[in-house]
Amino acid sequence: MHVFTGNMINQHKVSIFISRTEDGFNYFSHDKLFIMLDAATDKMDGLNVNIEESWNKQIANEWEGPYFKELVQFLRAELANNEIIYPPREQIFAAFENTPFDQVKVVIIGQDPYHGIGQANGLCFSVAPGVRIPPSLKNIFKELNRDLGIEIPQLGELSPWSKQGVLLLNATLTVRANQAGSHQNKGWEKFTDVVIKSISENREHVVFMLWG
């Protein structure tokens, strides 16, 4: 496999702030980008989500797109209805935080996040330490063992992969608890399509694996 290893242009991070407020939408394109999720409450319940600046240079236009605003409206309605959404809001963009655009070597694409309690952590197929390894990830580990002789790990946490240039990307970045596919066709797929197109057009020798 040929690997292109570029240097990061800028390690500064841009923050996305997902919040509950009655102020509705507010978007800023300065050092921080704010996505306001109105949950029909005056309580500010926000979490910072970091995205590497190198990603923001590629996808910044998406934040103002009509489809993305509709996606935010959908998530806002989910919160207003007290729906539980996975992964936790601070981990929704974990794939972009862990793997800067300029360091992407491999893209693994899943379908949508795990929908069980405590499973999804923002990296496709990955679970936090201490969480039982899901069947799909067990199968991945078994194939790695069978094909390459790699010892089957005891933990399902894949952040070491992401920090070596493997972008662990779900086509849909959120899901309602216990309802697989519940956030499909709400706008996430358009967003991740842009991500994939940007990588294919601006990075060289990247390997794409569609596992969803």
Name each model feature, range by range.
Residues 15, 20-26, 123, 183:
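Residues in and immediately flanking transmembrane alpha helices
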Residues 4-12, 18-21:
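Short, intrinsically disordered low-complexity segments enriched in Ser/Thr with adjacent Pro
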Residues 8-14, 27, 31-33, 44:
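N-terminal cationic leader/targeting segments used for protein routing and processing
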Residues 61-210:
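A polyanion-binding, active-site-adjacent surface
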Residues 33-51, 55, 94-106, 157-158:
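Short N-terminal signal/transit or membrane-insertion segments
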Residues 37-79:
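Polybasic, low-complexity association/targeting segments
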